[in-house]
């Protein structure tokens, strides 16, 4: 499949692209004023982390500003500024999905392309032999299968994750736009990260847009071939409510951030239960938010 997705404001088309191609692009989602404030805060934080020796740099010149919800109220504002992206996440995951992590990657000049991967890299390959199943704890990031995305499987493991990236700067083919292998989410396989995957296409979009993809879709941060452009995004990874998030938000969020959360944000950040998942020790407890552990009963005689 050589389909190249283009930006749209038509949510029906976006859902179709997401279902059939594995990713979609929606433009004009975030207000330009909000995008400007996010960009300013990302650059300020990135500079401070470099100056204090706390910067996390990957693939040569890509700096990740991690756990951004602790690093400025503007990131919390961005998380729920529009229902468009959240509706598309719901289209894939259903109700109750939660945030797994929120980071701001900055792809700097002369940065090579990331290795091709899927975010749902631990997904087991569907087996017909009952005892030939994958041991999920052994499916790490270095897992690869010599495969071709055009191969379709009769049975597929469903998507458990969706990644939503906000374009804080323009994403172009030569400044590090995310690249995708169209249709790869339907292969039931993981990419061979040692291959070049020349069939990958860039998700080009203007600032204020979002690109959103199925957790099974093969993708990578593209190469930034420019001399002076920094491609900035904010990456929000969403997971089904029974999946363990990358970041434990009830534990890791600063107290002043938790105090600002509204009910929608609390649900997205895992402060409420989903059926019996996330309870405080009382089965099927329906919690809107967690209480301090000191409030829980201890040994009793």
What are these regions (language model features)?
Residues 108, 168-170, 238-240:
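Non-catalytic surface loops within mature trypsin-like serine protease
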Residues 1-20, 27-143:
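Non-heme Fe(II)-dependent double-stranded beta-helix
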Residues 29, 102-104, 167, 183, ...:
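Short, well-ordered beta-to-alpha junction loops that form the rim of enzyme active sites
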Residues 191, 210-212, 217-218, 222-301:
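Non-heme Fe(II)/2-oxoglutarate
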Residues 102-104, 164-166, 234-238:
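A structural signal for short, well-ordered beta-strand segments
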Residues 72-78, 151-152, 197-201, 220-223:
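Active-site rim elements
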Residues 112-204, 244-253:
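Catalytic core of non-heme Fe(II) oxygenases with the double-stranded beta-helix
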């Amino acid at each position: 499949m050589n389909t190249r997705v283009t930006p749209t404001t038509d949510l029906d088309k976006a859902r179709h692209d997401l279902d059939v191609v594995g990713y979609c692009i929606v433009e004009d989602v975030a207000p330009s004023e909000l995008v400007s404030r996010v960009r300013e805060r990302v650059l300020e934080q990135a500079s401070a982390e470099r100056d204090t020796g706390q910067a996390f740099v990957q693939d040569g010149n890509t700096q990740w500003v991690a756990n951004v919800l602790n690093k400025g109220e503007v990131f919390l504002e961005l998380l729920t500024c529009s229902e468009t992206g959240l509706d598309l996440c719901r289209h894939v995951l259903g109700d109750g999905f939660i945030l797994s992590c929120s980071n701001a990657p900055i792809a700097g000049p002369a940065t090579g392309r990331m290795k091709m991967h899927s975010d749902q890299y631990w997904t087991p390959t569907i087996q017909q032999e009952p005892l030939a199943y994958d041991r999920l704890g052994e499916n790490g990031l270095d897992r690869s299968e010599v495969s071709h995305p055009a191969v379709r499987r009769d049975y597929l493991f469903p998507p458990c994750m969706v990644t939503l990236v906000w374009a804080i700067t323009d994403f172009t083919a030569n400044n590090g736009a995310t690249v995708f292998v169209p249709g790869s989410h339907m292969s039931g396989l993981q990419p061979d990260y040692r291959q070049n995957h020349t069939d990958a296409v860039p998700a080009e979009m203007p600032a204020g847009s979002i690109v959103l993809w199925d957790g099974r879709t093969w993708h990578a941060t593209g190469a930034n071939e420019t001399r002076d452009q920094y491609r900035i995004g904010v990456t929000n990874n969403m997971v089904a409510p029974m999946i363990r998030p990358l970041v434990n938000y009830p534990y890791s969020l600063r107290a002043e951030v938790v105090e600002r959360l509204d009910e929608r944000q609390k649900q997205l950040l895992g402060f409420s239960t989903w059926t019996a998942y996330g309870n405080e020790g009382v089965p099927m407890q329906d919690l809107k938010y967690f209480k301090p552990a000191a409030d829980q009963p201890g040994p009793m005689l």
